[in-house]
Amino acid sequence: MKRTAFFISDGTGITAETLGQSLLAQFESIPFNKFTRPYIDTLDKARAMVQQINAAAERDGVRPIIFDTIVNQDIREVMATSNGFMIDIFSTFLSPLEQELTAHSSYSVGKSHSIGGNSNYMERIEAVNFALDNDDGARTHYYDKADLILVGVSRCGKTPTCLYMAMQFGIRAANYPLTEDDMERLQLPAVLKKHHSKLFGLTIDPDRLTAIRHERKPNSRYSSFAQCEFEVREVENLFRKENIPNINSTHFSVEEISAKILVEKGVERRFK
């Protein structure tokens, strides 16, 4: 049976959605209709939200799952009248944390995501700009400033991984696509050799690579299984020859790939 899940907040909804998605992902056999509802910051909006929740409960024949990070007590009381299974993230964790720290929390909306009070904001922007400027081997003369350089065949997940590490951790990550010439020579390009200690390889199952490339260039040599199988085989040979640590991205999320890379390379996050 498909269930409905709401991620509700009187701020951006980032925290409710992130934690909620992580928890729901543990129930792989259950399909969910997921809805994010940010800025539920007035009583009128809260009452309208209750109507949405109750309508979903009536439609589905089972109550929706509600993840919320609402700070305002009056709004929380309105939300509690809904026919939903409520998981109040702040009240669940803040109360025991207040007891442990013997201090009251500020109950500030959007505190962790604010720009003005966040010293990490410019670090994040600079890391994202670095990832974009050094994407797909477009520029190589700034590799000395890179924390990491991801290498692999085209369309194996290098770009989204670099951007995720930039946005979440302030990591300056470049990426370089290894070409058919590189593979046939079984040699790293000269520009990568001098930065060997920063290299990390991504590989992927050939059938998955074929499907991804087919969406971009259908019925082409580039997207053929034979070509994808050749490139993956040769790039893995190159990784072994050059002793480049690597991971197969096929069955991992970008979050998991990023975490594994940082652990294996021993790269410290600029912020957490």
Curated annotation (Swiss-Prot):
Enzyme class: transferase
GO molecular function: ADP binding; ATP binding; phosphotransferase activity, phosphate group as acceptor; protein serine/threonine kinase activity
Alphabetical list of Pfam families matching this protein: Kinase-PPPase
Domain of life: Bacteria
Keywords assigned by UniProt, alphabetized: Kinase, Nucleotide-binding, Serine/threonine-protein kinase, Transferase
Substrates-to-products reaction catalysed: [pyruvate, water dikinase] + ADP = [pyruvate, water dikinase]-phosphate + AMP + H(+); [pyruvate, water dikinase]-phosphate + phosphate + H(+) = [pyruvate, water dikinase] + diphosphate
Residues given in the record as ADP binding sites: 152-159
Listed EC numbers: 2.7.11.33, 2.7.4.28
Similarity comment text for this entry: Belongs to the pyruvate, phosphate/water dikinase regulatory protein family. PSRP subfamily.
Described function: Bifunctional serine/threonine kinase and phosphorylase involved in the regulation of the phosphoenolpyruvate synthase (PEPS) by catalyzing its phosphorylation/dephosphorylation.
Name of this chain's protein: Putative phosphoenolpyruvate synthase regulatory protein
Organism: Pseudomonas entomophila (strain L48)
